[in-house]
Structure formats: C-alpha cells, structure tokens
C-alpha cells in the first residue's frame, strides 16, 4: 500500500507536473529544440499511461512492481538518459510512419460509423419515447373508463343536480309531483294548500278582496254560531254544536 502511494505521487509530480511546466516554457520562448523534446516525451508518456492501466490489473502482484514504475518514469524524464527521446526515435517513430495511412483510414471510418451509430441511437430513443407516451396514454384512458364504469346509477343520478337546466334529463313522476306541490305554496304565508278533499268552503270559493274577506268571514261565523230549526212548532236555537231549547214565558197580566 505504501509503495503504491509513493509510486503514484512520483508519477503525478515528476511524470506530469514537471514536464507540463517545461512544455509551457518551451512554447513561451518558442525554442524549437525544447519544443520537440517535450512533444516526444508526451507521446511516449501517453503510451506508458495505456500500458500502466493494463499492467495495474494484471501485474500488480509482481514483486517490486511499483518500484520499477518509479524507476521507469525517472528514466524517461532524466536529461542524462533521455529515455523518452530514445524510445520515440528507435521504436515509435518508425512504427507510426509505416502505419500512418492505415491509422488515418481507421480514424475516418470511426468518425463516420460513430456519427451513424449516434443517429441510429437517437432515432431508437425517440421511437421508444413515443411508444412509452402512447402506452401511458392508453393506460390512463383505460383507467378512466374503468372508473366511470364503476359508478352506479345512484351515483350518476346524484350528480344530475349540478348540471345546467338545458342538459338535465327528464324527471320522474314522483319528483315532478313533489316539485309541483312545492311550487303551489302560498307566497304570503308560506303554508301549502290542502288537497281538494280537505279544502274549506272559503278556499273553494276563490280569492276575495280585503273588505269582502272580512264581511264573508263575519257572515260565516254568525251562520255557524246560530242556526234556528223548527221542530213541530217549536224553535230550537243552535249555538255551534249545542242545542238550546227556547221555553215559552208565561204571560203576566197586570
């Protein structure tokens, strides 16, 4: 674990930060010699990074593996050994020169295929999104239909009172009769009228004016309170439901 931490620190500081700073100075001073030197170093270090990634997964168990990595990075960077320049001129430059045309063709084909693959993936993604939207819409419509079917007729008739007048269905006969009775209530007193069998004589005779109403009630009261019947030459006076017999007074002579 300690060897891994030390090797990682050496690679980051001496393998990346130090060459990056001297590459900046070479670009700033426009020194072609230093510029070529650090360009060769970065090409070799890129290849080293690829090989290191694979070796860390397969050769990390090898004894002194991390110490060898530290020694190799210092050998590449040292101005005395110039390991990066040596590897580039002896191996990389001849290999890249012989395979340059093939590498360029592979790069062009990779760009074209990558563009086509990206377009195909985009179309498939749009198709999947459209299919998912249609499926969700169908499922929601089915849920709404099942919800409406679950309502009973009682629930549907209970909602009819909230509809506009023009859109209400025809009323049943008991509802029409009940509403008709409510409409025939007296507006002055708020008392519903009686049926035809229970109406009094005053109600059956029709409306009167105020004066006629008072006179009519007085006559009816006097007629109901007093009725005279003649039974076998004798008069009986009736006050309401009581009968009062009239006795003859004896005549008094003076």
Curated annotation (Swiss-Prot):
Function summary: Microtubule-binding protein required to ensure proper cell division and nuclear envelope reassembly by sequestering the endoplasmic reticulum away from chromosomes during mitosis. Probably acts by clearing the endoplasmic reticulum membrane from metaphase chromosomes.
Gene Ontology cellular-component annotations: endoplasmic reticulum membrane; microtubule
Pfam families, per the entry: TB2_DP1_HVA22
PANTHER family, per the entry: HVA22-LIKE PROTEINS, RECEPTOR EXPRESSION-ENHANCING PROTEIN 3
Protein name as annotated: Receptor expression-enhancing protein 3
A Gene Ontology biological process term: nuclear envelope organization
InterPro entries: TB2_DP1_HVA22
Record's bilayer topology term: Multi-pass membrane protein
Chain intervals with Acidic residues compositional bias: 198-212
Residues with the Phosphothreonine modification: 200
Keywords of this entry: Cell cycle, Cell division, Endoplasmic reticulum, Membrane, Microtubule, Mitosis, Phosphoprotein, Transmembrane, Transmembrane helix
Sites of Phosphoserine modification: 209
Transmembrane segments: 1-21, 35-55, 59-79
Gene coding for it: Reep3
Location in or out of the cell: Endoplasmic reticulum membrane
Family: Belongs to the DP1 family.
Residue span of region Disordered: 162-232
Species annotation: Mus musculus (Mouse)
